A protein has these predicted regions:
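N-terminal and secondary-structure boundary signal
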Residues: 1-216
Length: 216
């Protein structure tokens, strides 16, 4: 009987000059079958889309400096530059309002309100949050992740595809899926972060035999 297996796909360094679907076919195509789910790290998708900047290119406002004082050092907004990037994308007053509402919500034991409102903050990888040479950059969330997932399915013939945001702190979120894929189920399968966005260079993971094991 087939069993689920997570296969990490090694690549070279992928940049904004690469097409992520081409890279998946080149490095993992030989191992992708019609019952498999192809998972790709959101930071690599965003880098390919040119959605990154360097900290020195940002003009940090007082709102970003203020809010950053209250952000946990392990969070995606650990630096003032990451916070400023989120403000540039969402608007500084929206992010400030989200912070105030989030602080009030925490009093009533309801966490996560800030990141639910300020979506750019939850999707931004701060400096050192991704693989070299982009570890000196701030990487924004990917654009149209559902469309990216659909392109992967169309090109590879796999059962499904997802764009995933996973870290070593047991945070697993699916930002985009192809049609018919249960994002919560895939997020749980990736909870231990099989991706290697640093020196491992394995930003692609194949969930083998997913369709048959899940009874699809």
């Amino acid at each position: 009987m087939a069993e689920l297996e997570l296969v990490c796909v090694p690549t070279r360094i992928l940049t904004d000059n690469d097409d992520i679907v081409d890279a998946i076919v080149e490095f993992g195509g030989h191992n992708i079958g019609p019952e498999d789910i192809v998972c790709v790290a959101e930071s690599v998708v965003a880098i390919r889309q040119g959605r990154f900047t360097r900290p020195e290119e940002l003009d940090v406002c007082w709102q970003a400096r203020l809010i950053n004082r209250f952000i946990h050092p392990d969070g995606s907004m650990a630096s003032i530059y990451g916070m400023q990037s989120a403000m540039n994308l969402d608007g500084k007053w929206k992010v400030l309002g989200a912070f105030i509402l989030g602080a009030i919500a925490k009093i009533f034991r309801k966490p996560g309100v800030f990141y639910a409102i300020a979506r750019a903050a939850s999707l931004t990888d701060d400096v050192t949050g991704t693989m070299p040479p982009f570890d000196k950059h701030i990487v924004f969330g990917p654009k149209d992740p559902d469309k990216v997932a659909e392109k992967i399915v169309s090109r590879t013939g796999c059962y499904g595809a997802v764009v995933a945001d996973v870290n070593d702190l047991k945070r697993s979120a699916i930002l985009g899926t192809s049609r018919g894929i249960d994002a919560k189920k895939i997020a749980q399968l990736l909870i231990d972060n099989p991706f290697g966005n640093d020196s491992q260079m394995t930003p692609i993971v194949i969930i083998k035999n997913y369709a048959s094991v899940s009874g699809k």
